[in-house]
């Protein structure tokens, strides 16, 4: 995948700037999880009842059942490969290696990283479920509100999955002012926020616990006594939680030194591509589970293993009437209770899907007027049985009796991804009020419900109303983003709720309007009409979008228009693909879904492509017009081959081959005319209404000898398995293609442009060099002056391939001798250390290399052996991809949580 704008070197191309796109983290998508959630058309509220295609539309508006969890395991496996585990010391050493490189300073004239946005990521109504224009930001994992919040001064903290912590003191205005407050953290992946208002202490647990492919691991717990202006790391939290993700922090209301902390498995790193096999979690680092501190976090004691959960403890609360009673939920294990401060535990609620390690129970406890404790529980996994909702009014009883309250208003509330988006919240002092959030009901919205993404009960869970859309318009209302993770309310009004989701933050007005009359207009009758009328009987009058100023998108990649270095596209986690045209404030969304890679044609920037998850990709012939995207990879998606979650894709950087796109699964697939005839594709394969695996949409074909196109097969020797992980074309000719797999195989083809796809041949190069690592290949950068010369980066750790250490190599293929050499560039006077690299680009003007890592960007100046910091000012954040424009002297970084940044090169 090209990540550079290159100025042509031949007479034919003299003066022409040619380019292609970068890459993004690519994760495995099993064949079983390739269907897409439904997408009803704007203006056709009953499309969910009429369409037969809705489960296979390309735009990925939800998490494929099982996909996010298996992908999370693959992100972990990417770092571990070829071993099964990542030892605790390696993740610590990687961070230390990065810090050492930064500590060496920076080279002359290397400047300051600048945020290029967006701070206002706009989504046009045509791409939104409700039809209303909106603004989005990155995934939020936790919220905390000051109980002294009033209309005139309301302090709210929000936690981002990869973007840190932001604070506002005017949370109740239409557009709050946000301040980033976690710049000193060792990671900006946040999983938990707890405000001890009695003592004025804010706790932040690092590492996201939501079991997604990019749920990044943390480094421990930070503490602030001034609202987040300054922080200190709890000394005992590093050994207990480094490399883990924190789900809950609970402070004993009678003893501020007593803390209970739940931890889960986390993922270290979002890279350009992802590994194949998933494994169980071995006992590395500190075990995940439930910990207790009695000295304010100076030390932590492991008190419960989640009864052997393979995922960890996802929820912890104390009984409101007895602080010695501890409730905890663990993946696949239901809800447990301790009556002796955590010394012993017993199960009180059994999971509904005990055979799935994806089963996740979320609960909330509240005090009843009679002194007893009520507990609400939402539980589900993936597939069947569908998610259910329960309540007991005496959680402290010897054997609590849970009543199944799974009515149509709350049934299947988190669909097939309860392990990812699942929240149950009851406001303190309002025991009959409960909010339940999960994912969109894609087959219902605009029909029997407004999606039921977030529902509210005011009668203790007996009945629910749908608060996912507001009443500001009957036709284009404001709505909540799918995938909900956190809810809090204004302390003086339990109906003013703040909702944190994959799309950022929304707030309700706190009052309601009856919109049940809309149900009949939707053509509903009988019981369906009755259900709809109940759900829409109290709809929020207004939902406020609070995402302005939040530059927290989780970019997977950035691509660049060769004709204009200020024109970018970038794919983001669950927020689609956005376009940058010079403004660091506003980037419009040009297509929805889980955005992966994107790119422009090297010959005509009006031709674009984007990828969703799996093998679903679109092309566009009309400058990215949101209504003109067409399905392009039907033949690939309809094939028996598997791929990574975001398969590698690259368009040919040579303008004479401007219609060619390559995409990797197990084979390399190719189109030579931008996926087919424009008129045919626009007439028969529009993105909004076409199944993503329609074999008639797109003309991609496998390249390579008949019967031997699969580059991961055993027929090519050792290191078999995995999928194609990296593809890169040489700009200086028309036929050289470099390809790598997730197991460390590296190939070169010298005739990838052959008209007869079956005549394309591949030569395996890694087998020529004893020092070529058998680890995950994260990127390839081809020398624009020599198609047989490239730089290759590797993920993983040297300890797993001790005879083949290294993360950055210079590789030269000698076609006459039939040999290839690998030169390790990690070492020297300033070694990189055992630091996985997520992406690599080269400044072809100076020869400097730039490496993206889990912690930031490093550079190796030409002619030196010293890796050092690439500029200053970039937050501590995982960098998923780099895109360079040597002629314009710009290096762009796609960060996974702090949006997009640029470094002006010397």
Residue ranges and their predicted role:
Residues 1-11:
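N-terminal Sec-pathway targeting helices
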Residues 31-906:
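Beta-propeller blade termini and top-face loops
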């Amino acid at each position: 995948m090209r990540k550079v704008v290159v100025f042509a070197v031949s007479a034919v191309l003299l003066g022409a700037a040619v380019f292609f796109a970068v890459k993004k983290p690519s994760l495995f998508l099993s064949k079983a999880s390739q269907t897409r959630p439904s997408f009803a058309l704007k203006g056709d509220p009953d499309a969910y009842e009429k369409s037969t295609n809705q489960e296979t539309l390309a735009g990925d508006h939800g998490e494929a059942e099982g996909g996010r969890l298996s992908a999370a395991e693959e992100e972990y496996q990417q770092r571990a490969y070829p071993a099964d585990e990542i030892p605790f010391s390696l993740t610590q050493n990687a961070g230390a290696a990065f810090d050492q490189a930064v500590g060496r300073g920076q080279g002359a004239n290397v400047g300051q990283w600048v945020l290029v946005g967006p701070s206002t990521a706009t989504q046009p109504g045509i791409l939104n479920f409700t039809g209303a224009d909106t603004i989005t930001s990155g995934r939020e994992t936790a919220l905390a509100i000051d109980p002294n919040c009033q209309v005139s001064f309301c302090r709210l903290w929000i936690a981002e999955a990869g973007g840190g912590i932001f604070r506002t003191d005017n949370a109740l205005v239409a557009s709050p002012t946000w301040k980033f407050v976690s710049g000193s953290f060792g990671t900006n992946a946040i999983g938990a926020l707890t405000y001890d208002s009695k003592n004025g202490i804010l706790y932040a647990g690092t590492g996201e616990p939501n079991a997604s492919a990019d749920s990044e691991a943390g480094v421990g717990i930070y503490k602030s006594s001034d609202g987040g202006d300054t922080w200190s790391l709890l000394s005992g939290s590093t050994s207990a939680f480094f490399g883990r993700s924190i789900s809950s922090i609970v402070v004993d209301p009678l003893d501020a030194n007593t803390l209970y902390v739940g931890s889960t498995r986390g993922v270290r790193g979002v890279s350009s591509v992802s590994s194949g096999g998933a494994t169980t979690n071995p006992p590395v680092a500190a075990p995940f589970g439930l910990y207790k501190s009695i000295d304010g976090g100076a030390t932590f004691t492991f008190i419960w293993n989640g009864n052997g959960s393979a995922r960890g403890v996802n929820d912890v609360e104390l009984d409101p009437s007895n602080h010695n009673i501890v409730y905890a939920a663990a993946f696949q294990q239901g809800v447990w209770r301790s009556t002796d401060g955590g010394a012993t535990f017993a199960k009180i609620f059994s999971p509904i899907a005990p055979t799935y390690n994806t089963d996740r129970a979320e609960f909330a406890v509240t005090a009843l007027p009679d002194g007893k404790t009520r507990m609400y529980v939402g539980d589900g996994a993936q597939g069947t049985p569908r998610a259910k909702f329960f309540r007991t009014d005496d959680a402290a009883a010897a054997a609590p009796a849970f009543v199944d309250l799974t009515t149509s208003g709350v049934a299947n509330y988190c669909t097939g991804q309860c392990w990812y988006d699942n929240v149950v919240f009851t406001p303190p002092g309002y025991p009959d009020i409960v909010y339940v959030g999960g994912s969109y009901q894609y087959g219902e919205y605009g029909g029997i419900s407004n999606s039921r993404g977030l529902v509210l009960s005011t009668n203790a869970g007996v009945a629910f109303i749908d608060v996912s859309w507001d009443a500001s318009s009957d036709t284009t209302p404001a709505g909540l983003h799918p995938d909900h993770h956190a809810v809090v309310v204004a302390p003086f009004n339990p109906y003013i709720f703040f909702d944190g989701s994959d799309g950022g933050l929304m707030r309700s007005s706190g009052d309601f309007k009856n919109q049940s009359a809309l149900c009949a207009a939707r053509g509903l009758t009988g019981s369906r009409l009755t259900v709809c009328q109940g759900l829409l009987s109290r709809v929020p009058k207004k939902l406020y979008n609070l995402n302005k100023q939040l530059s927290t998108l989780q970019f997977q990649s950035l691509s660049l228009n060769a004709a204009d270095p200020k024109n970018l596209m970038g794919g983001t986690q669950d927020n689609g693909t956005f376009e940058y045209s010079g403004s660091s404030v506003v980037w419009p969304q040009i297509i929805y879904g889980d955005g992966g890679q994107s790119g422009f044609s090297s010959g005509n920037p009006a031709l674009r492509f984007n990828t969703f998850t799996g093998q679903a990709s679109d092309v566009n012939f009309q400058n990215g017009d949101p209504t003109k995207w067409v399905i392009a990879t039907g033949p690939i998606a309809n094939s028996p081959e598997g791929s990574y979650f975001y398969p590698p894709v690259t368009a040919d950087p040579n303008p004479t081959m401007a219609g060619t796109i390559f995409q990797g699964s197990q084979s390399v697939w190719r189109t030579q005319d931008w996926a087919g005839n424009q008129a045919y594709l626009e007439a028969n394969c529009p993105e909004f209404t076409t199944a993503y695996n329609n074999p008639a949409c797109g003309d991609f074909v496998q390249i390579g000898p008949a019967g031997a196109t699969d580059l991961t097969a055993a027929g090519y020797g050792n290191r078999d398995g995995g999928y194609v992980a990296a593809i890169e074309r040489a700009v200086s000719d028309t036929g050289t293609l470099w390809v790598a797999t997730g197991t460390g195989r590296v190939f070169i083809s010298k005739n990838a442009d052959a008209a007869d796809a079956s005549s394309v041949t591949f030569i395996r190069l890694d087998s020529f060099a004893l020092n070529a690592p058998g680890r995950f290949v994260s990127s390839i950068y081809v020398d624009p002056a020599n198609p047989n010369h490239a730089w290759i980066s590797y993920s993983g750790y040297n300890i797993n391939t001790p005879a083949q250490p290294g993360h950055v190599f210079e590789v030269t293929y000698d076609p006459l001798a039939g040999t290839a050499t690998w030169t390790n560039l990690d070492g020297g006077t300033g070694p990189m250390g055992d630091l996985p690299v997520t992406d690599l680009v080269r400044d072809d003007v100076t020869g400097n290399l730039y490496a993206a890592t889990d912690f930031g960007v490093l550079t190796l100046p030409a002619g030196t052996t010293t890796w050092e910091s690439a500029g200053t000012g970039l937050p501590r954040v995982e960098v998923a991809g780099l895109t360079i424009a040597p002629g314009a002297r710009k290096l762009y970084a796609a960060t996974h949580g702090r949006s997009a940044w640029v470094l002006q090169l010397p």
